[in-house]
Amino acid sequence: MKLYNTLSRTKEEFEPLNDKIVNMYVCGPTVYNYIHIGNARAFIVFDTVRRYLEYKGYKVNYVQNFTDIDDKIIKRAQEENVTTKEVAEKYIEEYFIDADNLGIKRATVHPKATEHIEDIIEFIKILIDKGYAYVVNGNVYFETAKFKDYGKLSHKNIEELQAGARIEINEEKKNPLDFVLWKAQKPGEPAWDSPWGKGRPGWHIECSVMSTKYLGKTLDIHAGGPDLVFPHHENEIAQSEAAYGQPFSKYWMHIGYLNINNEKMSKSKGNFFTVREITEKYNPEVLRLFMLMAHYRSPINFSLDLMEQAKSAYERLLNAVANLKHLLTVCKDRELNEEEKRIKEKFEEYKKEFEDAMDDDFNTADAISVLFEMSKTANTNISGNSSKKLVEYILDIFLKLSEILGLSYRGVETELNDEEILALIEERQKARKEKNWKLADEIRDRLREKGIILEDTPEGVRWKRV
């Protein structure tokens, strides 16, 4: 299996540090608003990477953080006259509603920056002790000139980075590229005690601390959006490798940009969509399919016309599943004849083609093409006279491969009636009260598989069919 490593700019054989365990960190959202479809592309892509690694037999420790203290969160809190904690908690909840809707699996850990202040302070102390950071007026900065490999991820030297960087002039910094590790408190802003005075962490340090705390000093995969290569990921490498003296991540994965109607997504231009806006109009799996129909490193263009095309494509797959499920109820359970054995072999070949596509840098576009070939072959070769054993085999293989892409075709059937749904919700509430989070999550996942989405609100649990 090969993946493209931003660090080397080449496709490399994937060999995790530990034979059957993959430690993967994905930069999560800054929680001050609903996630937009650009965010969603990254989360869908890396959820799919995780699913395929699990399909291949790896145990994936998947960590995705929440940045829950930030200038944008502070601004939103001031506008709404609430605390930053209230803003963050609201939009973390909204994130999970959208993520569950899109079939994005929960991370092994979803750490929040504000819950790791002590860890962050200890990390900064290491950098100061090693001579990589300096303190000015309660602010702590990382001294980029001290880190000789600065620029290795973006493949630029310090002079090129300085020339291309849009960096505010700051008299406190020794170098314009130096970045803040700890920000001194400003009036009216939340702050925590530190050896340098009251303040809060810088953005870059949060990810270094949370990733290494839960996954170790060297990760297998660190992933995120294209805009994070510089400065965020570059700075993460600098501070992590300066602190620990070993490679921060073996592989770096970045998605391509997402444009809207051939222009960069921008709120001011009005060409901006939240996930919520799109999933209110389309089945969430249509958006998921749309995101995966292009290679993850390719830029993609989003428009409602293209979503209509994705909807038609999704319906073709949905119809194939519905047809196979119907045939299960009418076909006789007999052994395969010679022609059916040949058809079964053809589907074994399809499975191999799908895996080959995914083994080649997670080429979901080619993998989806294989699903369409499978649906076409099934529609033309399987009928009510076919062996039930063959139908079961084809349906099983089709659903397993679709599941790697996060497609469960929830629209095909909802076997649960309202009474059964309410009974399961009650069982989940009981599990939550008893702090049996595993059972509560299993019930939520089971309901989601049946096309039922739960929404925890202050008034209680709401549910809807999708």
UniProtKB/Swiss-Prot annotation:
Broad class of the protein's primary localization: cytoplasm
Superkingdom to which the source organism belongs: Bacteria
Record field: catalytic activity: tRNA(Cys) + L-cysteine + ATP = L-cysteinyl-tRNA(Cys) + AMP + diphosphate
EC number(s) reported in the record: 6.1.1.16
Motif stretch ('KMSKS' region): 264-268
Name assigned to this protein: Cysteine--tRNA ligase
Positions that bind Zn(2+): C27, C207, H232, E236
Keywords annotated in UniProt: Aminoacyl-tRNA synthetase, ATP-binding, Cytoplasm, Ligase, Metal-binding, Nucleotide-binding, Protein biosynthesis, Zinc
One GO process term, biological-process aspect: cysteinyl-tRNA aminoacylation
Subunit structure, interactors included: Monomer.
GO molecular function: ATP binding; cysteine-tRNA ligase activity; zinc ion binding
Sites where the protein binds ATP: K267
Gene designation per UniProt: cysS
GO cellular component, one term: cytosol
Cofactor: how bound: Binds 1 zinc ion per subunit.
Annotated source species: Thermoanaerobacter pseudethanolicus (strain ATCC 33223 / 39E) (Clostridium thermohydrosulfuricum)
Subcellular compartments: Cytoplasm
Cofactor: Zn(2+)
